[in-house]
Curated annotation (Swiss-Prot):
Compartmental location: Membrane
GO cellular component: Golgi apparatus; membrane
Record's bilayer topology term: Multi-pass membrane protein
Glycosylation sites: 3, 14, 20, 25, 283, 286, 344
UniProt keyword list: Glycoprotein, Membrane, Transmembrane, Transmembrane helix
Transmembrane segments: 64-84, 101-121, 133-153, 180-200, 228-248, 256-276, 291-311
Pfam families: DUF2434
Disulfide cross-links: none
UniProt key word Glycoprotein: yes
Protein name: Uncharacterized protein C56F8.12
């Protein structure tokens, strides 16, 4: 412990000793106990000082939650890389890439950093930088998660549109002046206004009073307004899913089930945002809060969402693959119809099925698609080869 001369020097520079084993002048704070005893010189310089927010205590429940969260984030990276390799093949322009995976990358970063910072919450005698980092990343994870849902639903809507146009041949029903295109133009602007405002109000809040345990600062109007705005952004994203389902109809492959699971997965986190905003006892920035509550309602929903999106993206074929499959199926059907028509024409030579043949005449070459042109060229080559070999039908 300090001798009397050291105590007088500290008091000369407005330091006060507190019962929790710290000494501070409201600018600098140091631990003072048997293991950590700061030494002050006559000029005010302090040596052997251990900052109050240094992790000196043993690991506890908050640290275990942080470690588990960080591990789940690292396990998610291989799934994310598989999806990036699948959907970014050929390096498409940035605006045409699957933006949900960019947001998932940011979500992994936020949750991992927040998890590591949460480890030191129990180990710090006085909360400081670790709690600030955790609080910032924790509040950042929710708007990022809602942005992921928005882009997944947007991609789903585009997939339904391409399915109706390419596969269903309903291009005439969706002209450029259709109201859905006007909605799709303004909807992202409205969504990001609510989502970004919710982010700026909560994540960019001054954290000094919050980490010191000021319940009024942790539940002030900024956090309440942020909760409402983020909830509106989530509802708006869900509304766009309903609009897409109404206009383009539900996907027969059952992909809409994955959309519903993703939208519901983040709902507990939104509910917890309201709970912690109106009650400091449940607030994640409160060092006394139950760590299991923070993990179950704070960390788990974004992790479940990220895993669901990555597994869904890995299991479901991409839009390009669906269009390629539709084109190949169309080619097979055209070849089958051409073969049937040629067989019927052969039988009509003997007076069989002539009326049916008149209804199955192939289209002119100018109106043929690429598959029909290919079949026509193959037929001509076969007929020329038959003539040259003398195999002409009498």
């Amino acid at each position: 412990m300090m001798n009397d001369s050291q105590v007088q020097l500290f008091q000369l520079y407005n330091y006060s000793v507190y019962s929790n084993g710290t000494i501070s002048n409201f600018t600098n704070c140091y631990l003072i106990n048997d293991e950590h005893t700061p030494i002050i010189e006559s000029d005010g310089m302090i040596y052997n000082g251990q900052s109050c927010d240094s992790p000196v205590k043993s690991l506890a429940s908050h640290g275990a939650v942080g470690i588990v969260t960080a591990c789940f984030c690292f396990f998610l990276i291989p799934l994310l890389l598989v999806n990036i390799a699948k959907y970014w093949k050929g390096k498409p322009p940035l605006l045409k890439r699957r933006m949900e995976f960019i947001w998932i990358t940011l979500l992994i970063l936020a949750l991992a950093v927040g998890g590591f910072a949460y480890i030191d919450v129990d180990r710090n005698l006085v909360q400081g930088a670790a709690m600030k980092i955790f609080s910032f990343t924790f509040q950042t994870a929710l708007p990022i998660s809602i942005a992921i849902i928005w882009h997944v639903i947007s991609t789903y809507g585009f997939a339904l549109y391409r399915q109706r146009i390419v596969v269903g041949k309903h291009a005439a029903h969706f002209s450029l002046d259709h109201w859905i295109f006007v909605v799709e133009y303004y909807a992202p602007i409205v969504f990001y206004v609510f989502n970004l405002m919710g982010f700026f109000l909560a994540a960019l809040h001054p954290w000094t009073k919050v980490v010191r345990g000021d319940g009024n600062a942790a539940t002030d109007g900024r956090f309440k307004a942020s909760s409402v705005l983020l909830a509106i952004a989530w509802v708006f994203a869900c509304a766009m899913f309903i609009v897409y389902s109404f206009v383009y109809k539900l996907d027969r492959r059952g992909r809409w089930v994955g959309m519903v699971i993703m939208m519901i997965s983040i709902l507990p986190r939104i509910v917890y945002q309201f709970l912690e905003t109106w009650s400091f006892t449940l607030n994640a920035s409160n060092v006394s809060v139950n760590a299991g509550l923070v993990f179950g309602l704070g960390f788990c929903p974004p992790l479940i969402l990220a895993y669901t999106v990555c597994i869904y993206g890995w299991a479901v074929p991409s839009i390009a693959e669906l269009e390629k499959e539709a084109i190949h199926e169309e080619c097979r059907q055209r070849k089958r119809r051409t073969t049937i028509s040629r067989d019927n024409s052969t039988r009509s030579t003997w007076g069989i099925g002539s009326e049916h043949d008149m209804q199955c005449l192939p289209p002119s070459y100018e109106t043929m698609g690429p598959c029909e042109k290919e079949m026509k060229e193959e037929t001509n080559e076969v007929e020329i080869a038959s003539i040259e070999s003398g195999e002409v039908r009498e």
